[in-house]
Amino acid sequence: MIAFIKHQVKTFGLIELFKGLAVTGKYLFKKKITVRYPEEKTPLSPRFRGHHALRRYENGEERCIACKLCEAVCPANAITIESEERDDGTRRTTQYDIDMFKCIYCGFCEEACPVDAVVETRVFEYEFHERGTHIMTKEQLLAFGDKHESQIAADRAADAKYR
């Protein structure tokens, strides 16, 4: 009886060993799918949600109308907006801050914006070296939007048929 149990344990162990080797051998000669980041980069979708930016109209006026929908819809409460009324009766933002540590990059702010003012770009490689620099101000977001406007416009055009 003991010999029978020892035989079963040895047989069971070898079968499992050969099954594991078969899986290893199966993938040993296939094309590798691992990307060696940062030397190699994968293509990004036009819908990729990375660093935020604020956009302007072609005449240079900022698009944000201070409706505060993005602030209301943000599940992480990462957006802070303060606004005031201008002489012509329209509202504009005086403060538009995004806390990048709180942001979960869900894209709700982008979807809620009626004038396409706040967008998320393809840029995902950024870092903060000092305390407090993780809060992006209105000026920083506008400058970032100005810098990447051509890519943002191309991504919006490519994604337009799905909106």
Curated annotation (Swiss-Prot):
It catalyses: a quinone + NADH + 5 H(+)(in) = a quinol + NAD(+) + 4 H(+)(out). It is found in: Cell inner membrane. GO terms for molecular function: 4 iron, 4 sulfur cluster binding; iron ion binding; NADH:ubiquinone reductase (non-electrogenic) activity; quinone binding. One of its GO terms (cellular component) is plasma membrane. It is an enzyme of class 7 (translocase). InterPro entries: 4Fe4S_Fe-S-bd, 4Fe4S_Fe_S_CS, NADH_quinone_OxRdtase_chainI. Its main location: membrane. The keyword Glycosyltransferase does not apply. [4Fe-4S] cluster 2 binds at C74, C103, C106, C109. The keyword Glycoprotein does not apply. Signal peptide: none annotated. Its EC number is 7.1.1.-. GO terms for biological process: aerobic respiration. It is a peripheral membrane protein. [4Fe-4S] cluster 1 binds at C64, C67, C70, C113. Residues 55-84, 94-123 form the 4Fe-4S ferredoxin-type domain. Binds 2 [4Fe-4S] clusters per subunit. Its cofactor is [4Fe-4S] cluster. Keywords: 4Fe-4S, Cell inner membrane, Cell membrane, Iron, Iron-sulfur, Membrane, Metal-binding, NAD, Quinone, Repeat, Translocase, Ubiquinone. NDH-1 shuttles electrons from NADH, via FMN and iron-sulfur (Fe-S) centers, to quinones in the respiratory chain. The immediate electron acceptor for the enzyme in this species is believed to be ubiquinone. Couples the redox reaction to proton translocation (for every two electrons transferred, four hydrogen ions are translocated across the cytoplasmic membrane), and thus conserves the redox energy in a proton gradient. Belongs to the complex I 23 kDa subunit family. PANTHER family: NADH DEHYDROGENASE [UBIQUINONE] IRON-SULFUR PROTEIN 8, MITOCHONDRIAL, NADH DEHYDROGENASE UBIQUINONE IRON-SULFUR PROTEIN 8, MITOCHONDRIAL. NDH-1 is composed of 14 different subunits. Subunits NuoA, H, J, K, L, M, N constitute the membrane sector of the complex. This is NADH-quinone oxidoreductase subunit I. It comes from Hydrogenovibrio crunogenus (strain DSM 25203 / XCL-2) (Thiomicrospira crunogena). The lineage of its organism: Bacteria, Pseudomonadati, Pseudomonadota, Gammaproteobacteria, Thiotrichales.
